[in-house]
């Protein structure tokens, strides 16, 4: 039986911490930023934790 491959798109978008949480980047901070307020762009910085149901699906895609 061959090894399972992890989903390459998911592996680029998500990161699993040592404790098992799944982190993602917040959407909406790539381009078209000049009309967005500083408050919005500041709120979009940093990583967010995935909801438990979604995290289970992502872990399956990553083979964890």
From Swiss-Prot:
UniProt-listed SUPFAM superfamilies: L35p-like
One function term, GO molecular function aspect: structural constituent of ribosome
UniProt keyword annotation of Ribonucleoprotein present: yes
InterPro entries noted in UniProt: Ribosomal_bL35 (IPR001706), Ribosomal_bL35-like (IPR021137), Ribosomal_bL35_CS (IPR018265), Ribosomal_bL35_sf (IPR037229)
Coiled coil segments of this chain: none
Record keywords: Ribonucleoprotein, Ribosomal protein
Ribonucleoprotein listed as a keyword: yes
Pfam families: Ribosomal_L35p (PF01632)
Gene Ontology cellular component annotations, sorted alphabetically: cytosolic large ribosomal subunit
Highest taxon, organism lineage: Bacteria
PROSITE patterns per the UniProt record, alphabetical: RIBOSOMAL_L35
Signal peptide: none
Example GO biological process: translation
Protein family membership: Belongs to the bacterial ribosomal protein bL35 family.
Protein name (record): Large ribosomal subunit protein bL35
The organism of origin for this protein: Streptomyces coelicolor (strain ATCC BAA-471 / A3(2) / M145)
Upper lineage: Bacteria, Bacillati, Actinomycetota, Actinomycetes, Kitasatosporales
Gene (UniProt): rpmI
């Amino acid at each position: 039986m061959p090894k399972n491959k992890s989903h390459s798109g998911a592996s680029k978008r998500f990161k699993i911490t040592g404790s098992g949480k799944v982190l993602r980047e917040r959407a909406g901070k790539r381009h078209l930023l000049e009309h967005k307020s500083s408050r919005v762009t500041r709120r979009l910085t940093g990583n967010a934790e995935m909801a438990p149901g979604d995290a289970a699906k992502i872990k399956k895609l990553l083979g964890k």
